[in-house]
C-alpha cells in the first residue's frame, strides 16, 4: 500500500469527526494519536496546536489526552502550558498513579528556572518510579540544578547516579550518560540560555548571550553550542533568516563532534528551507544531518530528517 502522509492524516481526522457508531469505539485513541501524526510526519506545529486548542479535549479528567498535550507543549517551547495541564490533573481510580506527571512538571519548572520546584518534582519522580526509562535524564537535570545553585558536591553526587541508575535506551538517557562519562559540566551561561529557550523564553535567552561571541568560550563544544543556541533562539523567535548563519556556523564547527548541535542545526536549516518551498535545498540539509555519525540523539534526528525528505519528495 502507498499513499501520502497528508492523506493518511486526513483519514484519521475524518474518523474523529465522524458521527457514526463505529467512530466512537476508537475516537479516544484517534484523538490521542492525531496531534502526534501532524507534528511528527507533517511537521506542522501550528496545525497541531490549533487542533489541540479547538478540540473538546478533557485535559483534567482524561489523563491520556492530558499527557499528549503536556508532552507536545513541553517539547515545543511552551512550558507554562505544559505545567498548567500537568498541575491540574484530577486524580481518578480509573488511572494508575503515574510518576511521569512529576517528571513533566520537573522539566517544565526547570525550563522556567524555578529550580526548587523542579528539584522537588524530579526527586518525587525518582522516588516513586519503579522503571528504568528517563531515570538517568532526571538525575542529570538534578545535577544541573545543584550546579546552577553552586552546590558542586551535590551536583557530583547526582551525576554519579546518572552512571549507575536507570538504563540508556532513550535518546535522553543516552545523552545524560554520555555527558556524565565525559566528566565535564555545561557552561553556565549556555545552560541557562538553553533552559530558557526550551521553555519558550527566547528574548530572555537572547539577553543572556548578548554581547558574546564564540571566542568567549574555550571549549570547542561550547563554541559550537553558542552558534547553535543563537540559531535556535532566532529560529524559535520567528526569525529564520537570522538563524541560518548561526546554524551554518554550528555545522562547520561541530560536524565531527559527539554533541548533537551540528546535526540538529542541519535539520533545522532543512526545515526552514522546506517552509520556504525550496525542497532541493531542504533535502540537501536533511541529508547533511543524516551523514553525521556518532552524535547524541542520532536516532530521533535521523528519523526527523528522513521524514522531511519524504515530505519534500512528495511535493
Cite the ranges covered by each PLM segment.
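Generic helix N-cap/helix-start motif at coil->alpha-helix transitions
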Residues: 1, 22-33, 58-68, 93-104, ...
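Structural motif corresponding to the intra-repeat A-B loop/turn of tetratricopeptide repeats
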Residues: 2, 41-42, 76, 112, ...
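TPR-repeat structural position
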Residues: 5, 44-45, 79, 115, ...
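Solenoid-like repeat scaffolds
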Residues: 13-24, 50-62, 87-97, 123-133, ...
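Residue-level recognition of tetratricopeptide repeat
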Residues: 36, 71, 107, 144, ...
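C-terminal structural cap/anchor segments
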Residues: 131-141, 148, 153-157, 165, ...
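Terminal, low-structured helical/coil segments at or just beyond the last alpha-helical repeat
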Residues: 179-187, 192-199, 283-315
Amino acid at each position: 500500500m502507498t499513499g501520502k502522509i497528508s492523506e493518511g492524516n486526513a483519514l484519521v481526522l475524518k474518523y474523529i469527526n465522524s458521527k457514526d457508531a463505529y467512530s466512537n469505539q476508537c475516537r479516544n485513541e484517534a484523538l490521542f494519536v492525531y496531534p502526534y501524526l501532524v507534528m511528527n510526519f507533517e511537521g506542522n506545529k501550528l496545525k497541531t496546536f490549533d487542533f489541540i486548542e479547538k478540540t473538546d479535549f478533557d485535559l483534567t479528567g482524561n489523563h491520556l489526552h492530558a499527557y499528549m498535550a503536556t508532552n507536545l507543549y513541553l517539547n515545543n517551547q511552551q512550558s507554562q502550558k505544559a505545567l498548567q495541564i500537568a498541575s491540574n490533573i484530577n486524580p481518578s481510580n480509573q488511572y494508575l498513579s503515574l510518576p511521569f506527571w512529576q517528571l513533566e512538571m520537573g522539566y517544565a519548572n526547570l525550563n522556567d528556572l524555578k529550580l526548587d520546584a523542579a528539584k522537588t518534582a524530579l526527586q518525587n519522580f525518582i522516588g516513586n518510579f519503579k522503571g528504568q526509562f528517563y531515570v538517568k535524564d532526571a538525575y542529570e537535570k538534578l545535577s544541573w540544578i545543584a550546579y546552577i545553585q553552586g552546590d558542586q558536591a551535590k551536583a557530583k553526587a547526582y551525576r554519579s547516579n546518572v552512571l549507575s541508575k536507570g538504563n540508556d535506551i532513550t535518546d535522553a538517557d543516552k545523552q545524560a550518560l554520555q555527558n556524565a562519562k565525559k566528566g565535564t559540566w555545561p557552561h553556565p551561561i549556555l545552560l541557562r540560555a538553553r533552559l530558557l529557550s526550551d521553555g519558550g523564553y527566547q528574548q530572555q535567552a537572547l539577553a543572556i548571550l548578548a554581547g558574546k561571541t564564540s571566542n568567549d568560550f574555550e571549549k570547542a563544544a561550547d563554541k559550537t553550542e553558542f552558534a547553535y543556541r543563537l540559531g535556535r533562539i532566532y529560529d524559535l523567535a520567528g526569525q529564520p533568516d537570522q538563524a541560518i548563519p548561526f546554524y551554518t556556523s554550528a555545522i562547520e564547527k561541530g560536524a565531527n563532534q559527539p554533541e548533537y548541535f551540528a546535526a540538529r542545526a542541519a535539520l533545522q536549516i532543512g526545515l526552514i528551507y522546506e517552509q520556504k518551498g525550496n525542497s532541493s535545498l531542504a533535502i540537501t540539509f536533511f541529508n547533511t544531518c543524516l551523514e553525521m555519525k556518532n552524535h547524541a540523539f542520532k536516532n530521533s534526528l535521523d528519523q526527523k530528517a528522513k521524514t522531511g525528505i519524504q515530505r519534500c519528495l512528495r511535493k
